[in-house]
Design a protein with these regions (language model features):
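FAD-dinucleotide binding site
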Residues: 1-313
Length: 313
């Protein structure tokens, strides 16, 4: 509803609008790719019936238990990282087999707002007194009210709604006086933060099929740029967005932009050959190091239950 009410027209994404390449740059035929959804769904359904809270383990361990050898199948591994690790933000070696998909989804199709997702926020922010550039340093509270200390002054009020990202709470960069309850701090420590790294590459011309929404690549390392979003399918911009999932983002985000860019371009040249020209611009996300996030989003790791999320509210 918010997307529909925004000033820009939302465009629906289609996960089936996909072309997948093997690691040698060959396009895999539809008869190989199309059954992957059902294969993955069947595998995860089998795990759902087999695992519960009493015998929870990592998703990778559960997969190996119910289907020995599945993780050695490069197509199944690609589907797991591209869909499951992307959706959750966590590596299958860390995800809870019992609860990894216990979250709720909004109704309707997934959409992209070509003009930017701030089109959703702008009408919501209208008439609100929003102070930018005020980094919160300390929140003091008692029965008489609250006081918030920022990098540019202090604010007092009757109460505060604190929406700090879980990653920021885990880093303890904002002080609370008195400290938050021990039970709350334990839940913050218990729930892991995951990561998804994106590399946006802008080119002079599109050397790929502009009508294809997604490109897949069977990389030799799980999570190493297996998925590309073609922004040209949604807007008049020759942009490909490379995505990295699972454990790989934590490793790759420590490298300089030039090295990451070269690594992604090597894959694009494997996929598209000499037609893959050098990008005009390159933008690398580093959510794990962002001081206002410290991670992309949380996930249900082994030993974590849905109630742990509910009790953070």
């Amino acid at each position: 509803e918010l997307a529909a009410a925004s000033a820009t027209m939302p465009l629906v994404t289609d996960d089936d609008n996909l072309v997948v390449y093997d690691r040698n740059g060959n396009i895999l035929p539809d008869e190989i790719i199309d059954p992957l959804d059902k294969i993955l769904e069947s595998l995860l359904d089998e795990i759902d019936e087999w695992v519960d809270a009493e015998n929870d383990r990592s998703l990778a361990s559960a997969i190996d238990a119910v289907n020995t050898g599945a993780l050695n199948d490069e197509l199944i591994l690609w589907a797991l990282t591209t869909f499951t690790e992307f959706d959750t933000g966590g590596a299958i070696e860390e995800l809870s087999a019992a609860y990894f998909n216990a979250d709720s989804a909004f109704r309707g199709a997934d959409v992209i707002l070509p003009a930017g997702f701030d089109a959703i926020l702008e009408p919501l922010a209208a008439n609100l007194d929003i102070r930018l550039g005020h980094v919160v340093e300390k929140i003091s509270y008692d029965n008489s009210g609250i006081q918030i200390t920022t990098s540019r002054g202090e604010f007092a009020g009757n109460f505060a709604v604190v929406t700090l990202p879980l990653g920021v709470l885990k880093q303890q960069v904002v002080a609370f006086d008195p400290e938050l309850p021990t039970s709350f701090r334990n839940r913050v420590a218990k729930i892991p933060m995951g990561n998804v790294t994106k590399v946006a590459l802008k080119f002079d011309e599109a050397f790929w099929d502009p009508a294809v929404q997604y490109f897949g690549y069977l990389s030799e390392i799980k999570g190493k740029w297996p998925y590309f979003l073609n922004y040209r399918a949604f807007a008049d911009a020759n942009i490909l967005v490379a995505l990295s999932f699972g454990a790989y983002p934590a490793e790759v985000e420590r490298r300089p932009d030039a090295e990451i860019r070269a690594e992604v371009m090597d894959i694009l040249r494997t996929m598209f050959g000499a037609n893959a020209t050098e990008p005009l611009q390159c933008l690398v996300t580093r959510w794990s190091a962002d001081p206002y996030a410290y991670g992309a989003y949380s996930f249900t790791g082994t030993g974590v239950e849905p109630e742990d999320f509910d009790n953070l509210a």
